[in-house]
Amino acid sequence: MCDLIEPQPAEKIGKMKKLRRTLSESFSRIVLNVISFVFQICVTKMSTRNCQGMDSVIKPLDTIPEDKKVRVQRTQSTFDPFEKPTNQVKRVHSENNACINFKSSSAGKESPKVRRHSSPSSPTSPKFGKADSYEKLEKLGEGSYATVYKGKSKVNGKLVALKVIRLQEEEGTPFTAIREASLLKGLKHANIVLLHDIIHTKETLTLVFEYVHTDLCQYMDKHPGGLHPENVKLFLFQLLRGLSYIHQRYILHRDLKPQNLLISDTGELKLADFGLARAKSVPSHTYSNEVVTLWYRPPDVLLGSTEYSTCLDMWGVGCIFVEMIQGVAAFPGMKDIQDQLERIFLVLGTPNEDTWPGVHSLPHFKPERFTLYSSKNLRQAWNKLSYVNHAEDLASKLLQCSPKNRLSAQAALSHEYFSDLPPRLWELTDMSSIFTVPNVRLQPESGESMRAFGKNSSYGKSLSNSKH
């Protein structure tokens, strides 16, 4: 029998709540600084399962002595995702800005009291880190966890994106917000959205980002039927460049999808929304398998695996690559996890222990649940891959059911698909845009650009002639 809890006087309860709020506020302020420090000192303790072609700085698990291994624990529960269908999945994006992470939180009121990041300046001038240093111009999107505004800095006049996170009265700062802020503070790269400022008040935490006017989802919606092949190549190169940067720092994004890839008016692609990102060296109980929008979620995670590494992001890269070329999502599941897996296996083949060692040990893999499919050439599923030299080969090396077989971001940058790009692109510093290299620019989009490219390319012509 459970012990009963005696009722507490109202006055005592009020004092306890006040104490809890005070401790929560203090903790959230401290943790924003501490977690970055912990992240830096823990990186050498990281161990990972390797993707193909991963840099030697990330060592395969089997090269680490047994007494030095740090493993993520797999937690198996009685939950079966196949027994209860999820809601129909739809591709959506936040209005005019992808840099928003919808999570649960309660609304709060604004407070002028500033907690962090004050910069020295005159007493009457606007300051970085001050709530009144930014003017809200328009709302871009809203969720239960955060609201994003287009704003303007009163300090330098630049446009910004203000991600206003409402703090729970008793719980303090959501950990997803702390995680995003702490990771982005240390990331400086041309292909990662820049965090300008952090404003912490009693009721809100505001992350001030550079303003980027659209995202890849909106860009593809505006140009249906597949993007210009040269633009696909430049977008993919930038995506891999940004991922290689964070993967070398032992950070997984974990939520790659077109909505989280911002596109500037000059064509720069920037990784955004690091609310689910994880520093692999920071200990945690287990990685949740409820990450990544269903269409871009890899089969190992769909089957319940909680032991994953940078290879998780590389599956999403493959899906986005195919979608940019084909003009439709690679695996647009419409029902549930079962349907999503069936769509994957229809193209890549139903896995077994020979094609994917260890698949039978995954929590939700039951062979009798799946139709037995054999693998096929990717061009049979997505014909436009055949229009572009080496595109099918690169896609096939990214879309591997077994995570260990997926190409790493660094290795993908060296793939033949990119061989016709200027060599200077591989020599750029982290903060240099690819568009600083002469003759590197986006091409005009048209509805028939991919089809026209296929007919005019030597590869496309050879395929066309082989049909006659």
Swiss-Prot record:
Keywords: ATP-binding, Cell cycle, Cell division, Cell membrane, Cytoplasm, Kinase, Membrane, Nucleotide-binding, Nucleus, Phosphoprotein, Serine/threonine-protein kinase, Transferase, Wnt signaling pathway. Serine/threonine-protein kinase involved in the control of the eukaryotic cell cycle, whose activity is controlled by an associated cyclin. Acts as a cell-cycle regulator of Wnt signaling pathway during G2/M phase by mediating the phosphorylation of LRP6 at 'Ser-1490', leading to the activation of the Wnt signaling pathway. Acts as a regulator of cell cycle progression and cell proliferation via its interaction with CCDN3. Phosphorylates RB1 in vitro, however the relevance of such result remains to be confirmed in vivo. Residues 455-468 have a biased composition (Polar residues). Transmembrane segments: none annotated. It holds the Pfam family Pkinase. Serine/threonine-protein kinase activity is promoted by associated cyclins CCDN3 and CCNY and repressed by CDKN1A. GO terms for cellular component: cytoplasmic cyclin-dependent protein kinase holoenzyme complex; cytosol; nucleus; plasma membrane. It is found in: Cell membrane; Cytoplasm; Nucleus. The lineage of its organism: Eukaryota, Metazoa, Chordata, Craniata, Vertebrata. Its EC number is 2.7.11.22. InterPro entries: CDK (IPR050108), Kinase-like_dom_sf (IPR011009), Prot_kinase_dom (IPR000719), Protein_kinase_ATP_BS (IPR017441), Ser/Thr_kinase_AS (IPR008271). Belongs to the protein kinase superfamily. CMGC Ser/Thr protein kinase family. CDC2/CDKX subfamily. It is a peripheral membrane protein. It comes from the Eukaryota. Found in a complex with LRP6, CCNY and CAPRIN2 during G2/M stage; CAPRIN2 functions as a scaffold for the complex by binding to CCNY via its N terminus and to CDK14 via its C terminus. Interacts with CCNY; CCNY mediates its recruitment to the plasma membrane and promotes phosphorylation of LRP6. Interacts with CCDN3 and CDKN1A. Interacts with SEPT8. Interacts with 14-3-3 proteina YWHAB, YWHAE, YWHAH and YWHAQ. This is Cyclin-dependent kinase 14.
